[in-house]
Regions:
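Strand-connecting loop/turn motifs
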Residues: 196, 231, 359, 388-390, ...
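Acidic/His/Gly-enriched intrinsically disordered linker/tail segments
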Residues: 6, 117-194, 210-211, 215, ...
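Amphipathic alpha-helical substructures
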Residues: 176-264
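Zinc-dependent metallopeptidase catalytic helix centered on the HExxH motif
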Residues: 86-146, 203
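C-terminal outer-membrane beta-barrel translocator/porin domains of Gram-negative envelope proteins
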Residues: 366-368, 428-439, 445-449, 461-468, ...
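Outer-membrane beta-barrel initiation region
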Residues: 294, 304-305, 316-427, 431-432, ...
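Hydrophobic helix-coil surface modules that form long, contiguous segments used
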Residues: 1-99, 128
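Beta-strand-rich binding/interaction modules
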Residues: 232-233, 246-317
Length: 736
């Protein structure tokens, strides 16, 4: 058997004696469809033939007449698609997939592109024309989503240029993103630069001139420059061979009355290396006018004429320049609150945060909780966000009403969080400042963390961090007995960690080390009654986790922990010791449901477990010590899995065991309990849910084995040997 074809540079074949065949044509192009038995409903009855004809009609309109006599659309074994001259292999008969794969026949086959050397000129190009097809049929949003994703990668410093030769990408994931998505964005930006009509003529001229010939970047650029009449050398260099960020802002603005209306001068300021012409819109009282900057200079003046009085100036309102900071692209004339910027204001439902590319959001939420000192506490919280990564700030004002309590402590509290301001942007960095005066405590926490991943889909993810924390208790009526001593603490902590997957195991290791001081203006001994309390302390922890699935329904989790926190000659203040059962008091300080005496999840009849410390889940949360080593084991069996549901997405049964040992034989400084060996084991049931963007779980646990601390001079442990506590969690408290 001999196969013969002219004007092709690739070859493929597919053979299956069980194939079903249907045929048709588009003009003088024969259409052959081969599909697998059992897929008649999806492929047969002319479905795949008609969709292939529709794809040919679309592509002929975009580029020009199909240059070969036939096209074969073959149903392949797995999903996705593959392209060859006069043949496409499709995992389904989806119209968009057929348009994409058949587009390769034009852009890789007829325009003979070397995909190994310049994949963007094939994969990026056909992704672009597929998006045009989707938009022509009323399906929008794909290109905008890709733009936001790619800009995020640029901000994280993980992008690679679209023009690299295939083997030079650091991994297959980066290759796919760069030549498909970044390649597609290049063509969208070219269309923005030259205009839609010129872009259409570029595509048809390029196809007509180079069909059935070998093509490269130079061939396409020459056509684009000839048709548009523009020098595109810089644009091609930036769009294909770099990953430079773009950021323009509005500088000064002036408006004046003219004989025909109003003239507005706008200073366009370039703040990042990326250069692209920027649309400048002036919104008047009854009309809108636009002009375009050159975009090359650091500062450039643009004049816009309107008939009515100008009210507002916008840069790039259509989000076509890939400007990463759109918050500085708007200015209004006159005085306006919030700096003259528009914000998307919404009623916060807690479970979801709207994220926009072109403006920030601010959500408002009334809050209510309870504690024994202030009673029912009412407040108002706002939280903001830009781009899902910047200006993630929170402001909360709350106050106790004295309702439902005999103590009637009226206290106005404030909490402010500033997170990731735009002006501190740095790849992989997260900056957070908390300042608070809440329920008998005031202080501040400043933290900086950097994460780094050499590869996007595999390999280790490393993080390093620095945190400065200052906390002072000032009203003991709010404090949980046995968790605080009457001293302020200030400490500096360094942290480092790594997460990775090795075979079936998801592994993690994190360590912290730091030190600080405890103080009280009345003197430590007078404030605490302890003559042994050293003003200086050191603190270090090391945590390792290992998690794997044993089968589709079984999962095993392991955790090891070691921690030490002590003064120069012995124990440090209670609030900075190592806690046996979970998170320590300072880790819980931002959660009003876990913060103060009598809080909803900190009552004697409710047990909420917030992971941390030794994770000895059967113990009273006030049990602490200077040094502890602990191990946790968990075996989980899924009994119900409904991934598409919102409530009870997954229900599982779990058995757990925890063991810990105090490194030094010591007594708890407040309760007097002697602490040495601790252990617990039990079983529980978990249910996982998802509301909005938030996944959470609740669980009930039954400790069946429990080793209490040895009796001392203080009160007995709160936990009894057998108990069914309620644990409601908005984050996982599993050991890993």
């Amino acid at each position: 058997v001999i196969w013969y074809a002219e004007d092709v540079h690739h070859f493929a074949m597919s053979m299956n004696p069980d194939y079903r065949y249907e045929g048709g044509h588009w003009g003088d192009v024969a259409i052959h469809v081969l599909y697998q038995p059992g897929d008649t409903a999806a492929w047969g009855g002319g479905v795949a033939v008609q969709r292939t004809a529709k794809a040919l009609e679309w592509l002929d309109g975009v580029f020009g007449k199909f240059a070969w006599p036939q096209i074969s659309n073959v149903h392949r074994i797995e999903g996705g698609g593959t392209e060859f001259p006069m043949m496409i292999h499709d995992g389904s008969a989806d119209q968009g997939l057929i348009v994409h794969e058949l587009g390769h026949n034009y852009l890789m086959g007829i325009l003979a592109n070397n995909e190994w050397r310049e994949g963007w000129l094939d994969e990026g190009f056909t992704s672009y024309q597929t998006t045009l097809f989707d938009e022509a049929n009323g399906h929008f949003g794909g290109a905008a989503g890709d733009e936001a994703f790619l800009t995020g990668m640029d901000l994280d410093g993980t992008s690679e240029p679209a023009s690299l030769q295939s083997e030079y990408y650091r991994d297959f994931t980066s290759y796919n993103i760069s030549i498909y998505s970044r390649g597609e964005q290049f063509f969208h930006q070219l269309e923005y630069l030259v205009g839609g009509e010129s872009m259409h003529r570029i595509l048809r001229t390029y196809y007509d001139r180079w069909k059935l010939k070998h093509v490269d970047e130079e061939a396409f650029r020459d056509v684009a420059e000839e048709v548009s009449g523009m020098d595109l050398t810089g644009f091609f260099a930036q769009g294909l061979h770099s990953t430079e960020l773009t950021d323009y802002t509005i500088g000064r603005k002036e408006r004046k009355k003219t004989d025909s209306g109003w003239s507005t001068k706008v200073e366009v300021v370039r703040k990042s290396p990326g250069r692209v012409p920027v649309e400048v819109w002036v919104i008047g009282q009854s009309d809108t006018a636009a002009a375009r900057s050159v975009g090359l200079a650091e500062r450039e003046w643009v004049t816009v004429e309107t008939r009515s009085e100008p009210k507002e100036v916008l840069l790039d309102p259509r989000v076509r320049t890939r400007d990463w900071d759109m918050m500085n692209n708007q200015k209004k004339f006159g005085f306006h609150p919030l700096g003259g910027r528009d914000y998307d204001l919404y009623l916060d439902t807690y479970f979801s945060t709207p994220v926009h590319r072109d403006e920030a959001t601010i959500g408002f939420l009334p809050t209510v909780w309870y504690n024994d000192a202030g009673g029912i506490t009412l407040g108002l919280r706002s939280r903001s966000d830009y781009f899902g990564r910047f200006e993630q700030n929170q402001f909360l004002v709350s106050g106790g009403t004295g309702w439902a309590t005999d103590e009637d402590v009226l206290d106005l509290d404030e909490y402010v969080r500033l997170r990731n301001p735009v002006w501190l942007r740095s790849p992989g960095m997260t900056q957070t400042l908390d300042v608070f005066n809440v329920e008998g405590r005031y202080g501040a926490v400043l933290s900086v963390e950097r994460t780094h991943r050499p590869h996007l889909s595999f390999g280790p993810e490393r993080e390093v961090g620095l945190r400065l924390r200052w906390v002072v208790p000032d009203d003991a009526r709010f404090l949980v007995p046995g968790e605080f001593e009457d001293v302020g603490t200030a400490e500096l902590e360094l942290s480092a960690g790594v997460r990775d997957r090795q075979g079936p195991w998801q592994l993690g290791l994190k360590g912290t080390a730091g030190g600080g001081l405890v103080y009280n203006s009345r003197g430590l001994a007078n404030a605490t009654g302890r003559n042994d309390l050293d003003p200086y302390f050191y603190r270090a922890t090391l945590e390792g986790t290992a998690d794997r699935t044993l089968s589709p329904r079984w999962r095993l989790g392991l955790r090891g922990f070691a921690g030490v926190s002590a003064g120069g000659d012995g124990e440090t203040a209670k609030q900075r010791q190592i806690y046996a059962s979970g998170a320590d008091p300072l880790e819980r300080i931002t959660n009003p449901f876990l913060r103060s005496r009598g809080a909803p999840l900190l009552r004697p009849d409710v047990y909420y477990h917030m992971a941390g410390g030794g994770n000895l889940r059967g113990y009273d949360p006030t049990v602490s010590m200077s040094a502890l080593v602990a191990a946790n084991l968990e075996l989980e069996r899924t009994v119900l899995d409904r991934a598409q549901k919102k409530l009870f997405k997954r229900v599982s049964l779990a058995g757990f065991g925890d063991a810990g040992h105090a490194i030094a034989d010591e007594d708890d400084p407040i309760t007097g309990r002697n602490i040495e060996f601790l252990a617990d084991a039990g079983a529980g049931i978990r249910a996982e849910h998802r509301l909005g963007q938030t996944s959470f779980r609740h669980s009930g646990r039954l400790p069946v084995l429990y080793q209490p601390p040895r009796p001392g001079s203080g009160p007995a442990p709160r936990r009894r040997r057998v108990r069914l506590p309620l644990a409601l969690q908005f984050r996982s408290s599993m050991v890993v």
